[in-house]
Amino acid sequence: MKTVAALTLLAFATAANGQFLQDCTNALDGLYALGECEPQFLTCSGGIARIMDCPADLIYNEPLLICDWRHNVIGCEGSGESSGETSGEGSGESSGEASGEGSGEASGEGSGEASGEGSGEASGEGSGSGEETVENVCENLEDGAYSSGGCTTYYFFCTTNTARFLSCPTPLFYDADSQKCIWKSLVEECKEDLTITDGSGETSGEGSGEASGEASGEGSGEASGESSGQGSGEASGEGSGELEPTCEGKADGIHPNGVCSTNFLTCSGGIARIMDCPASLVFNPTILVCDWPRDVAECAGLPTPQPTCEEDGYFSFGQCSSSFTACTNGRAIVMFCPAGLKFSESTVRCDYESNVSECQETSGEESGEASGEQSGEGSGEASGEASGESSGEGSGVEEQNQCVGLDNGLHAIGCSPRVLSCQNGHVDIFECPSSLVFNDQSLICDYPQTSLKCLIEDTILIDETPIAAFDCSTDGLFSDGLCSATYHQCTAGQLINFTCAASNAVFSAANTECVDSSTLLQCH
């Protein structure tokens, strides 16, 4: 308890001074912010500092000690996409080439003014109205969870007239009756929207401003503004020459993206996203799932798509690079080493720069630091912390046999953040970011509620009760994650954060106390 109190005092002192820790010198074990609205945070354990990345689109929320949406972090609401894309009405009217809405400007129909009114992101008026909605949406409503209306993935919590906006993980939708994120087919409001639509007709210039500004704002607007005066804003930033579909006129949900395509279109709140099917599968518009080409009527007589990866394995992006490509069954997946590590193609692992042969020619630096992965080959634990993977070398027959009977590719290891990679008998183990688990249906790291294995194996941690707001209306102790050393206590409506004192201890929601991490299955 003394350790927890000291940690709390240190956090208050840091906030009062307006300073942020950059290393763990004289710091207690715990999590610390690296700055305001930062997508990374600092972890201190035994005096050792590690910089960790939040999942995509999230930033570190220091009061809650979690990665959170930008609009949920005080002071960061207006510093994200809305302020970074196009500020002011003039940008959409006169400088279309410099913004994501430029494609709409070129067409003459989807101009900056129209896209600003429709998307709420391109103009100051749009962002202002968004703030007004945040302040007034909970007026005269009781505290609790509410749907944003209709068939949607968005919902919000009301706590003392203050709104906290959230969205369901893809591809779930919010059900107002059960107050949970569930499959679209089970949501009453979505049943009338479950119709098959053709995704090939959305190519007009009217929707191009939204598509280029929201779905492919990184480069599509600029590319279309320069290459065409006819408003070819649908051209994707990847330069593929294909038309980028929009969600204009489409209900929230899943839609085809062409005929016999290896990807599909998802629409959520008018925002279009292209999702890839797993390797060797194409989208079946009849049942709205990825399926074998032989079972999709539209694929009859069409040539089989060629794989983007000729050989399975892991390949570096370049000499002394922290990025690498994982090729699995002809599909390329871009992966990244943890902060401070480089990918070694010769050893097929992330390692310190001094231990990567590809880095020696460029850096010439030699370090006496011992590699955490080498000492961790026997246990798999040190390797998982330092490089984001456990090589499995020397860990015994049991780990080598994990790939027996499994196809080449990625596989979930139960309801856990660990990912098993099988490549022609070679075993690798990767780890998802904190509080996420690997979903072997979608082949991505996702929230535990989306994993079928979590729903089957872990009935204690995966709570099927209706969603509750973080308003501490219920007294008790609550864990901050699947295998987390941090937890919080709610007493008379007040929230107090705690951290387990022992270095190897995590909080058990079932026992309502800190226990040794080796006793919990989800921590293995």
Curated annotation (Swiss-Prot):
Knockout mutant characteristics: Worms lacking cpg-2 and cpg-1 exhibit defects in cytokinesis during embryo development more specifically meiotic chromosome segregation, polar-body extrusion, osmotic barrier function and polarization. Embryos lacking cpg-2 and cpg-1 proteins have multiple nuclei lacking plasma membranes and may also have weak egg shells. Oocytes lacking cpg-2 and cpg-1 show cortical granules that are reduced in size.
Region (Disordered): 78-134, 196-248, 361-399
GO MF term list: chitin binding
Signal peptide: 1-18
List of glycosylated residues: 103, 119, 208, 212, 355, 497
Top-level taxon in the UniProt lineage: Eukaryota
Residue spans of biased composition, Low complexity class: 382-392
SUPFAM superfamilies, per the entry: Invertebrate chitin-binding proteins (SSF57625)
InterPro entries attached to this UniProt entry: Chitin-bd_dom, Chitin-bd_dom_sf, Chitin_bind-dev_reg
Biological process, per Gene Ontology: eggshell formation; embryo development ending in birth or egg hatching; mitotic cytokinesis; regulation of cytokinesis
Functional summary from the UniProt entry: Required for polar body extrusion during cytokinesis in embryo development. Affects cortical granule size. Has roles in meiotic chromosome segregation, osmotic barrier function and polarization in conjunction with cpg-2. Binds chitin.
Protein name per its UniProtKB record: Chondroitin proteoglycan-2
Organism taxonomic ancestry: Eukaryota, Metazoa, Ecdysozoa, Nematoda, Chromadorea
Protein encoded by which gene: cpg-2
